[in-house]
Amino acid sequence: MSTNRHQALGLTDQEAVDMYRTMLLARKIDERMWLLNRSGKIPFVISCQGQEAAQVGAAFALDREMDYVLPYYRDMGVVLAFGMTAKDLMMSGFAKAADPNSGGRQMPGHFGQKKNRIVTGSSPVTTQVPHAVGIALAGRMEKKDIAAFVTFGEGSSNQGDFHEGANFAAVHKLPVIFMCENNKYAISVPYDKQVACENISDRAIGYGMPGVTVNGNDPLEVYQAVKEARERARRGEGPTLIETISYRLTPHSSDDDDSSYRGREEVEEAKKSDPLLTYQAYLKETGLLSDEIEQTMLDEIMAIVNEATDEAENAPYAAPESALDYVYAK
């Protein structure tokens, strides 16, 4: 990372630091959830570790007052940037009534919050893609200046929903930003056993849209790609397919044993490019972050995480008689 790249992209010094703070908050919430899971307090974790830079860099490039996001299950960085809180995410992890995603009904990672235009996802992967296309179409019909931003893993890009959504969006030049977070594994299946093409973005040409592959460990590179896609969408030029390359630093989920399909040496080598470390180094090079500032930031974040954990652990579960609430609109 070279000096002051963020300024060349139109980001202020404060925005550049805020990106790091959001990445660090996502990581610390995620780490706490693993501890809670291993101590038997929450049943399931599906991690964002290693993908925070792509998620936060993308979110900062969007209009967070207007655009719609349709995140996939690892996108803690996206939803935090769009207004969810540590408390919201902990309520979801503990499946408590105050969980804003589903009132304690869904598994963690099924993000949804109407007030922040975070659209609820489903457990079958890639269902969010055609939904994003539908939102973009509705925005076009209602003459609203919005974009729909949708994410998915590289394994999900092999599903029919991806093809149908990408084709429809391209034909109708809809303002959709497709972002594939390629973390090298679809659960246990390595990338080279999933697809024959070199990059997921190579598929874009078949739909008649631009495709670009960027370093998912660099939030500024992702920011630039998403910003350009957002501007292109606003000009009425249609969708863009962005592929971010990162590495999943944890097992697929808390129920997975990744030692059965990848070695510790591979994971340890990937940790050398941990986006929190590389972006931290950039901020220190540019004089925006010092050890003292970082420690203060970490102390503040851990206080937030601790408070969110305590509140969620002590919060009530949903009443049994409310089990069928929210099935139908009233």
From Swiss-Prot:
Spans annotated as Disordered: 249-272
GO MF terms held by the record: 3-methyl-2-oxobutanoate dehydrogenase (2-methylpropanoyl-transferring) activity; metal ion binding
Keywords assigned: Magnesium, Metal-binding, Oxidoreductase, Thiamine pyrophosphate
Domain of life: Bacteria
Database matches in CDD domains: TPP_E1_PDC_ADC_BCADC (cd02000)
Reaction equations catalysed: N(6)-[(R)-lipoyl]-L-lysyl-[protein] + 3-methyl-2-oxobutanoate + H(+) = N(6)-[(R)-S(8)-2-methylpropanoyldihydrolipoyl]-L-lysyl-[protein] + CO2
Coiled coil start-end: none
Pfam families in alphabetical order: E1_dh
Biased segments, Basic and acidic residues type: 259-272
Residues the record lists as binding Mg(2+): 154, 183, 185
Cofactor(s) this protein cannot do without: thiamine diphosphate
GO biological process, one term: branched-chain amino acid catabolic process
SUPFAM superfamilies: Thiamin diphosphate-binding fold (THDP-binding)
Positions contributing to thiamine diphosphate binding: 72-74, 123-125, 153-159, 183-187, 252
Protein EC: 1.2.4.4
Binding site for substrate: 44, 73, 107-110, 123
Quaternary data: Heterotetramer of two alpha and two beta chains. Directly associated with ODBB in the E1 complex.
Protein family (similarity comment): Belongs to the BCKDHA family.
Function: The branched-chain alpha-keto dehydrogenase complex catalyzes the overall conversion of alpha-keto acids to acyl-CoA and CO(2). It contains multiple copies of three enzymatic components: branched-chain alpha-keto acid decarboxylase (E1), lipoamide acyltransferase (E2) and lipoamide dehydrogenase (E3).
Name of the featured protein: 2-oxoisovalerate dehydrogenase subunit alpha
UniProt source species: Bacillus subtilis (strain 168)
Lineage of source species: Bacteria, Bacillati, Bacillota, Bacilli, Bacillales
